[in-house]
């Protein structure tokens, strides 16, 4: 069966994001992936602040100063016969809900683990989000050029802590100064590592066969024997790769390598284009939309301000779900039921914008937004439906925000509501007083809000600590019981930026007690946009 040109384009697309704990090497991997995709000629390895070769994917002013990626940018590059869309996710302590929401716009994730440290806190949280949609996961064990933990231990830890089976595809030979390369379990080939070649794509020497005497000569008899012994254990004690289980999010293929040394990244990329799914169907509130449909649909998962310091603009990022975007197309914004002509959509290579003539399912478009587009907005060619599964997450950090000039209360509220629509932060207005409480998932969100209030709304604000540990959105099917709950808990209720009722708890114990006391009230940790 020959596919139509449209379906061929759809089948070529792979859209993925990288999830990791800060400093596990995510930005370096992003660089190397782009190098293999020929999107950049030499990888601008991320160094300290003095280095002038800033990594291509870190670009807002604050990021340049801090050497971190705050904003989720999008990069498209060709690899083999595929077109890959890589959505970069903020990695540092300073990550935000954007990171979570970006994971709702991809069909697959690459989990990067620092092999010296194993599974870390942020990785756990991000994996929980991928679980909401059983997203397929590939795993890259990074930093093999350093001393690492025992590889079998690492696999056990991933399986036990993240509840996903591991299927090793490559296996390391030594580590640190003794790192010699990796063996590919399914190709029966050993790839030999040379250090100092990290900035370019290196020619790799390959030794075929596990019992080939050349292997002993290349890595030394001891390491060669150790490899054979370890592989006996691996083959006996780990999962075989099974594509169906991978696509169901039940097992993850595991690759070993060093992103800094640019070694092993291509094995992972080959796995990605071979196994990761082409654009997947999506649920709406009325039906499932298939990528093969010819009518255009898409949803907004993130809004970013100030991508162009010369213009104070915002860009809404839209994931194309079905149909082909063409320049000058008329689309319906379902929430407002208005038709808009989109003539200047953008694609990105972090920071370099280019106007796009056409886009297909799996691609990400940037739409200019002057405050009319919100997160979760659905665009169609007229059909009235809304994509689901683009959540707000309950914040984990809270501050009270106060004005230096009390006369600017109106501007402050306007600014905060707009920033919350954009997903930069969440705002809660307690019912029992006039406080304004700002909730975030990462600390840096607070700095960003104050900086943007000042530059965009001319409002000077400061934070104070507030006795709030967590928030949950509340609802109840029984109106009478809900009224009683609201009456008795008025001092702990607040409205968010979209006027949804939330319970703000002073501690986790306080939240648990409230949940036990009011079993008919539902306390939600996420809320649909």
Swiss-Prot record:
Sorted alphabetically, the Gene Ontology BP terms of this entry are:
regulation of translational termination
Please provide an example of a Pfam family that matches this protein in its UniProt record: RF3_C
What SUPFAM superfamilies does the record point to?
Answer: EF-G C-terminal domain-like, P-loop containing nucleoside triphosphate hydrolases, Translation proteins
Please state every residue range assigned to the domain named tr-type G. Answer: 11-280
Give the main location: cytoplasm
Keywords of the record, alphabetical order, are: Cytoplasm, GTP-binding, Nucleotide-binding, Protein biosynthesis
Q: Write out the GO cellular component annotations.
A: cytosol
Where does the chain bind GTP? 20-27, 88-92, 142-145
A GO MF label: translation release factor activity, codon nonspecific
| UniProt cross-references to InterPro entries, sorted A to Z | EF-G-like_DII, EFG_III/V, G_TR_CS, P-loop_NTPase, PrfC, RF3_C, RF3_dom_3_sf, RF3_GTP-bd
**Localization annotation:** Cytoplasm
Q: Which family does it belong to?
A: Belongs to the TRAFAC class translation factor GTPase superfamily. Classic translation factor GTPase family. PrfC subfamily.
Q: What job does the chain carry out?
A: Increases the formation of ribosomal termination complexes and stimulates activities of RF-1 and RF-2. It binds guanine nucleotides and has strong preference for UGA stop codons. It may interact directly with the ribosome. The stimulation of RF-1 and RF-2 is significantly reduced by GTP and GDP, but not by GMP.
Q: Identify this protein by name.
A: Peptide chain release factor 3
Q: Which organism is it from?
A: Shigella flexneri serotype 5b (strain 8401)
